[in-house]
C-alpha cells in the first residue's frame, strides 16, 4: 500500500554473445556441479523429462510437433513476436536433433526483448475508466533443483502447488480459466505444465494439443502470444510478457486475428525457472471491458 502506481518489467539482451555462451549463462538456473557442468544443460534435462513422459504415457513425436506448430501459428499473428511465419510439421521433424527426442524447433530461441506493466491500486484502476485486469491470485513455489534426485522426471510438483494456491486465492478452478500463457521453453514443457496445473489428466495434454483443444479457437487456448517458442524467450522479460498477453485477451484488446473467442474473463500465467525449480502462477480477471 505504500505506492499507488508502480512500473514492473524486465529486459534481456541475449544475442550479443555466442550460442554456447548464452547456453552457459542460462545453465546458471540449473544444478551446476553434477548436471550442467557435466553437459546436462537445459536441452538435455528437458529431453530426459520428455523421454520419461513418453515412457509413462505414450507421448509421441507428433504431439511435441503439434505444440511447436500451434505456437508458431499464434506468433505469426503477433507483430511483437520473434518469429513471424507459420511452420509445418515437416519443418519441425526434420530440424536438427538437439537432445533426443528434442529437435531444434522444440526449443525456445535466444531472444532480445523487453516487457513492461503498470501496476496500480484498485481505486486508481477504477478511476481511470479504462479496461484493466485484476490480480485475483498470485503464488510462488519451489522444487528440487537436481533432476537426478527426483523420483519422477516428468512431474512438476512446484507448478502444481503454485497453480493450486493462486486458484484458491481467486476462488476459481482451472476450468474457469479461459486463457493460458505457460512457460513452453521446450515443447514438452507446455505439455507437462498443462498436466501439472490440472487442466488435463496426466498423459492427456499431448493428445489434446494434437486435436486442437489448445488452439486459439479451441476449448482451452494456450499461448495465444506464440509462447516462448514463437514469441521468443528474453528471459528477464518473459513473465511480464505473459501477463501483458493475458491483459490484452481478458480486456478484449488483442488483435482480432488472435483474439480468443468467447470474451474470456479469467486467465492464468505460469512462469517457470529451471526444470520447475521455481514457479510463479498468476490468475487475472478482466474488468471494465
Language-model regions: role of each:
Residues 153-160, 164-187, 191, 196, ...:
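Extended C-terminal subregions enriched in glycine
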Residues 20-31, 123-124, 196-203, 286-289:
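A glycine- and small-aliphatic-rich helix-loop capping segment at beta-alpha/alpha-beta transitions
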Residues 40-89:
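N-terminal leader/propeptide and maturation segments of large enzyme subunits in energy/redox metabolism
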Residues 5-57:
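Flexible glycine-/small-residue-enriched beta->alpha junction loops
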Residues 2-4, 177, 243, 264:
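Short, high-confidence coil segments that cap the C-terminus of an alpha-helix
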Residues 147-152, 184-207, 218, 234-237, ...:
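Short glycine/threonine-rich loop-to-helix capping motif typified by GTGT followed
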Residues 46-50, 121, 156-170, 245-252:
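Short, well-ordered amphipathic alpha-helical segments that serve as non-catalytic structural scaffolds
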Residues 32, 65-66, 97-165, 213-225, ...:
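Condensing-enzyme catalytic core mediating Claisen C-C bond formation in acyl metabolism
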